[in-house]
Every structure is written in C-alpha cells, then in structure tokens.
C-alpha cells in the first residue's frame, strides 16, 4: 500500500505522481468520504433548484397580491434566470482560472446575501433587481456541482453519485411549492408576508452551507492542470489513506494505460477538432432542453391558475406534481451507470415530449396531477443523465468554462421563455404551450443521437 499513500512524490519516467492523480482517483473504491462530499455538494444543488422553481411560485403569488399583469409576471420569473445567465458565464470561467472550491464559496455567499435583501423588497422594481443579483450568485452552482463531483468521484460510481446529489437537490422543488402553498394560506407569519419567508429560508440555508463548504479540498485534477502537482499529490494521498483505513486493505493498483496527463488549454480549444462538434451539440441541447424541462416547473403554477384554479390550489397541485422530481432522480440512480448516458437522455426526453401535451390538455384534477407527476419523473431521469454526461464531454482545463457557457445559453433561453410561453398561454391555451415544448424535445433527441459521443464507464481523460 506504500505505493499509493506515501507522502513523497513518486516519479515515473520523469513525471511527478501528480500527473497520475486522475487514474488514482478513478480506481478508489467508494467510501464514506465520497458519500459525505456528495451530500455537501448536493445540498448546494437543493438551494439552486429551490431558487429556480421559486420564480414560478412568486409569479403566481404576487400576481394576486400585487395585481401583476402579464409582463410583470413574466419579469418575476425571468429576472433570476437573467442573473444566472451572467453568473454562469462569469463564474464558470473563473472556476477554471481560480479553482472550483473558491467559486463554490463566492457563488453561495452572493446568493445568500442578495436573497436576504430580496425578502425585504418594497416593490416590484426592487424585487426584480435583487432577484437578478441573487441569480447572479447562483449562476454557476449546478455547473460547479457537476464539475467538482465528476473530478473527485471514481469512474465506476460517477453517474450514480451525481444522481444521488441531484436527488437531494430536487427535494427543493416540491419544498418551494409546498412552502408557498402553506405560507400563502397563512398570509403572514410574525407580521411578515408569507412569500418573503420563502426567500429568507433560501438565504439562511445557503449561508449555513457556505460554512460547511469551507472544509472542501480543491480538485486535484484542476490543480494538476495548473501545474500544482505537489498540492494535488497531498490531497490524493490523504484521500487514499482515508479510504485505505476505512476498507482495511490494500487499494487497487493504478492502471498504467489510464495515465493521461492533461494540460492547460485556451478557451478557443472549444471550437477545434472534436471539441467543436461537442460544443455545437451541447449548445443546441441546452437551448432546447430549457423549454421542455424548466418550462413546466417554472410555469406550472401560472398555467394552473390559467386553468381556473385558485393560487393556493395551483400551488398544491404543482407541489404534488413536483414530487416526481426527487422520485425521478432516485429512479435514475440504478439506470445511469448501466445504460449509455446518450440513450438514457433520449428515452427520458421522449417521455417528457409525451407527458407535456397530456398535462396541457388535462382538465380533471386527477389528470393534471398524474400527468404532471409523470412529466417530472421523466424530467429528472433526463436531468441527471445530462448533468453527468456534460462533465464527460470536455477536458479538465475547459470543463467548467465549456459547461458554464453552454449552461448560460439555457439561462438566456429561460429569460425569454416566460414572455413567449405566457403569451402563447394567453392566446392559445396550455395545450399549445406544451405541444410546442414537445416538438423542441424531439429536435433535442435528434441532436444528441447524431452528434453525442458515448461515455458511460470511461475515464474522463479517455472520452
């Protein structure tokens, strides 16, 4: 076991052992440390997804309390997404330059601060500005969740453990709707309007999580690309010692064939050779998936009020439908490392395309809840598969930037989505909204089938 836990950097053919960090991490058996890391990172996903789906809840609540019109309701949903667009572009690129851990702390700190201020917003203008700023803080959260976990987790469980993190994260979606329904029904708590408590809860939870994340190590893969091999060695050796103590035996040997050192690469590398094909495929994917995936979650409460239900009823029905998000995420866990990611993405997207129009045409309460639930189940099998898949498309030196820039396109689409979708909803009704969404999901399937590479079960450095 001395070959894996020695504190003295081993050299192999003149190359420090830091260049073998990726292969050493990949061959580790999953441990309590890996599970704890997944838990801490997954809680961050909870607050990101809570915030994303909170926009639809706030739009439904404030439309009634502040008598908002069509444009104002759309703006409440869009403001956070616009902030996420800017944040994803800026913070994800900074994460490739300054490190994953540092940006983890910056983004949660910014979100907690501005979300707390948002709870005190006196009018719509202040609310929109502060929603934008809180979204700016969260812009790169899911990008960093994917990147950080992928760079630490052993390849044999990479997909499954990222799915665990998102299963925890997606509990935030029904929580946002259920809290909204309860707090709206209560009208005020300690003299403060219920919807403001939704923002306070997110801010305080994120602030607590930021304190927990201060103990996280930097990604050894990122350190290795930066030429900081000694630091990478210390982190990997410490992890090896921890896992060896837990398992009580020798660690698996490092496969020599998998020692593929990575290097710093310029951002322009995204548009050269094989990376260009993957970049184009993923940009198209992110624009299309936003409509089919976030379209339902962010618009469902507003769509249900358009069907004639009260705000409280709409939030309750949405919350019941949203229970499919964590359940769908849990369902993906046994599938994600057994079925090729690309195939699973396409199958789940077809499920979304089928359930969306059924929800749009539904009038009976049981049908609304049933098809909404099935849609969210399919959505999170889809979501977990693509979050794992995108970490496997790009090399370490580009991973955060490439994923973040593509993700920012989805946030930009999300800015326009409520204005377009609510106009279609007003003029043509819910069925037209979800039929159009289904058509875009079918285009997404073609994009992934034609341009997406296979990735399941391979080392990040070998895809």
Where are these regions (language model features)?
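Transmembrane-helix signature of 12-pass secondary carriers
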Residues: 1-463
């Amino acid at each position: 076991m001395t070959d894996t836990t020695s504190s003295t950097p081993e050299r192999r053919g003149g190359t420090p052992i830091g260049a073998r960090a990726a292969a050493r991490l990949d061959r580790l058996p999953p441990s309590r440390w890996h599970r704890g890391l997944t838990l801490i990172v997954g809680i961050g996903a909870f607050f990101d997804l809570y915030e994303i789906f909170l926009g639809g809840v706030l739009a439904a609540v404030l439309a009634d309390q502040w008598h908002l019109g069509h444009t104002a309701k759309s703006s409440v949903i869009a403001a956070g997404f616009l902030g996420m667009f800017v944040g994803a572009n800026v913070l994800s690129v900074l994460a490739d330059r300054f490190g994953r851990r540092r940006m983890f702390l910056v983004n949660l700190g910014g979100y907690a601060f501005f979300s707390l201020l948002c709870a005190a917003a006196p009018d719509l203008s202040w609310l929109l500005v502060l929603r934008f700023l809180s979204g700016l803080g969260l812009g790169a959260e899911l990008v960093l969740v994917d990147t950080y976990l992928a760079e630490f987790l052993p390849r044999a469980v990479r997909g499954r453990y990222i799915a665990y993190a998102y299963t925890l994260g997606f509990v935030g979606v029904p929580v946002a709707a259920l809290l909204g329904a309860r707090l709206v029904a209560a009208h005020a708590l300690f003299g403060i309007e219920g919807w403001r408590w939704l923002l306070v809860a997110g801010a305080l939870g994120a602030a607590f999580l930021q304190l927990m994340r201060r103990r996280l190590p930097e990604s050894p893969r990122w350190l290795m690309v930066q030429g900081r091999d000694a630091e990478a060695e210390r982190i990997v050796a410490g992890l090896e010692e921890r896992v060896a103590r837990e398992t009580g035996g020798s660690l698996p040997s490092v496969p020599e064939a998998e020692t593929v050192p990575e290097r710093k690469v310029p951002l322009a590398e995204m548009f050269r050779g094989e990376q260009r094909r993957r970049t184009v495929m993923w940009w198209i994917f992110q624009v299309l998936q936003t409509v089919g995936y976030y379209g339902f979650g962010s618009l469902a409460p507003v769509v249900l009020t358009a069907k004639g239900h009260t705000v409280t009823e709409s939030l309750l029905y949405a919350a019941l439908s949203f229970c499919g998000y964590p359940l769908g995420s849990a369902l993906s866990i046994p599938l994600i490392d057994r079925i090729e990611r690309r195939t699973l993405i396409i199958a789940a997207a077809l499920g979304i395309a089928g359930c969306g129009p059924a929800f749009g045409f539904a009038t009976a309460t049981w049908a609304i809840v049933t098809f909404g639930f099935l849609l969210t189940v399919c959505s999170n099998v889809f979501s977990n598969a693509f979050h794992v898949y995108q970490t496997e498309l790009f090399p370490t030196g580009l991973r955060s930037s490439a994923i973040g820039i593509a993700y920012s396109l989805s946030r930009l689409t999300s800015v326009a989505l409520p204005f377009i979708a609510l106009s279609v909803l007003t003029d043509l009704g819910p069925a037209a909204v979800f039929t159009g969404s289904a058509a875009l999901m079918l285009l997404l399937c073609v994009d992934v089938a034609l341009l997406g590479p296979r990735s399941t079960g391979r080392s990040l450095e070998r895809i």
